[in-house]
Structure formats: structure tokens, C-alpha cells
Amino acid sequence: MDAIRKASGQLHSYLPSLEFNQEHHRRINEEIGQQLSVDEVLQHPEFPHVNWPLQPDRKERIDVAAGRGGPFKISYELHGHGPRKIIWIMGLGGYMKTWQRQTKDFGHTESDQYSSLVFDNRGIGESDKPLLRYTTFEMAKDVVELLDHVGWIESRSVHVVGISMGGMIAQELVSSSRESSLSHLNFISTAPRIVRTLPYMENVRNRIDLMWPKALGAQISKVKADCYSAEWLKKPDETESIVQPFPTNGDRFASGELTKRLLPGAFTRQGFLCQLYAAGFHHKSAAQLKQLADAVGRERIMVLHGTGDHMIDFVHGKMLLAELGGEEGGVTKSFHDGMGHVAPFEIRHEFKRIIAGRIAETEKMAS
């Protein structure tokens, strides 16, 4: 616990000394209007079905990080058996079920075309939550060991989609000497390093604050405001239902978040703070990003970000794009007006078209 307290103290020191500002959360909550309470979500007939029973072709917990603070277990699922291999790398506090829309769209609906690999990072879900210093570089090494285990080692064979902290981990795959197997990199709502933009830093402090005891409804409300646009939150539930749709997209999100937070051992303070340490201290310089782009090929990289992102401010997406070489250098730009932090939810069907299109384009390139 001393290590956790030290990490928490370092993160608080890293953040600017600002009086916490609730204005953004207040505005979002006013705009989206009344949504279901925690009790109402739990009693909704769709709640037991919010995590779909998507049966994987393969599911294991494997040892990683021997000699790197481990070994400890990483849990993964492989869905589909198609020739196009996609690994989905989740962000801070998210677990593999958060990818279920993409797991269904790629690994089940088109299982003959795609093989979809999802997993829980160290510190979350069904993976172990060791108490040690996490870094995005070490978490990328976990990913490399997972790719080796499933045999995804051929040249230019793996399509990488990393969101938020997952995008930071994806940046480190090149440093982990895995660039030869990467077909292309998709950086979703992420940053090469955190610059002190007010909205982001306030919200990171907010995420730390979420770990201290308080009403679950208040926690969910704050995550909504951090990660999603008001326009999307207040729309009628767009996700396919088993029994009955939730009233709004925001209620659907709340149900998924509640299943994670109420599952014993899945979402812990220790694991969250260890991941937060890794994300908060991730740093890629402009020179390092140039090396990354040189190694992978700029035409094999996409940067996707929403202008309404209040978790990792849009300035980070613009910075990442520019320092990788920009559109003029061959990097694909996919910026979306008003979108929040979680493109796989807010623009699910467009997101699928974008990722499928990038896969098709890069497969035509010479290795």
C-alpha cells in the first residue's frame, strides 16, 4: 500500500494546482437531462443482458512478464478465424468486454474475414493486478508476449487498434521491437504525452477522485461527462437489445459500467491507480514519434480523435498527427467534430467502416 500511496502522491504532484472545476460536468448533466438512477439501471429488464454471450474461439489466462516483476496472468479471448488479424488494446480502467461491439462486428458477424484478439491489461478485469510500477512500455511487452503466444508473428500481419492508454501502449510496440509484424497502427483518442490543457488535467484529477468512496451514481455521472458527448448520451439507446432497449445511450453506458464495477475483483483501486500511473507518465517526444513513423511507415498510421474529447483533449490528437509527420507525410487523419473520447461507442458503424477500410488499404501495400 505504501507504493500505491507514493504513486498517488506523485500523480497529484504532476497535476497543476487548480481549484477543481465542476462546470463541465454540470453543463453536460444539464444538457442530457434526467437519466436512469443506479437502482433503475439495475432493475431494467435489459441489465442482465448488457454483456453479450459472445463465445470466443479461444480463451486463456497466460503467464507474462517473467523477469519483469512477474510472472502474472493476462486474460485474453480470440474471436473469429479470418485471415485479417486485429488486436484491440483498451484504455485506462476499461476491460475486454468494453470492445464487445467491435468483437461482434469483426469477430462474429464477419468471423470468416477477421480474427479479433481482445484482452485485459494488467490491473483490470480477469487479468492479475500486481502491485508494482506500471509503464506503457512494460504493458507493451505484455502485448508482445501475448502476440507471440497466439502465433501472430508474421511480417506485416497484425492490425493494431489502441484507444486512450491503449494508444499509448500501441506507440510502445515499436520500441518493443515488434514493428516488423505490424500491418498498421490506429491511434484512437490518445496522446504522445500529456500537456497541461485544463480540461484534461481537471478530468484526470476527477478520475483519481472517483476512487475515493462516494455514491456510485455520482461516479457514473462523472465518467459520462468525461468520456462522452452530451449529444450521444441523450439519444435513444442505439445498441441492439435482447429484451428491451434502455431509454438512452447514457443509460446503456451506465449499465455496462455498473457490471464492471460490481463484479468482484474486476475493478480495484490498486489496479486503477497502477494503470493511471502508466498513462499519466507516458511520454513520446517528437523525435521518438518520427522514429516510430519511420519504422512502421506513415502510410500505415491513422490518428483518430474527437474535437469534443474531455478526457484527452483534442490538442493531443493534433500534436500526435503533426509529430508523426502529418497528412502531408502520409499519416491518415480522422478527426470528428463534437465527438467525445470513445469513438467505438459514439460512431460504432462509421468506426467499423474506418477500421475495415484501413485494413483493406494497408493489405494492398508492399511489405
Regions found by a protein language model. Name each.
Residues 175, 181-218:
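Flexible "cap/lid" loop of the alpha/beta hydrolase fold
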Residues 38-132:
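Conserved HGGG/HGGXW glycine-rich cap/lid loop of the alpha/beta-hydrolase fold
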Residues 115-161, 176:
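Active-site loop/oxyanion-hole signature of alpha/beta-hydrolase fold enzymes
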Residues 221-293, 297-300:
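Alpha/beta-hydrolase
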Residues 310-316:
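Conserved alpha/beta-hydrolase "acid-adjacent" motif
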Residues 318, 324-367:
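Catalytic active-site module of serine/aspartate enzymes centered on a nucleophile-bearing elbow/loop
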Residues 303-305, 309:
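Short beta-strand/loop motif that positions the catalytic acidic residue
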Residues 162-166, 170:
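Gly/Ala-rich beta-loop-alpha elbow adjacent to hydrolase catalytic centers
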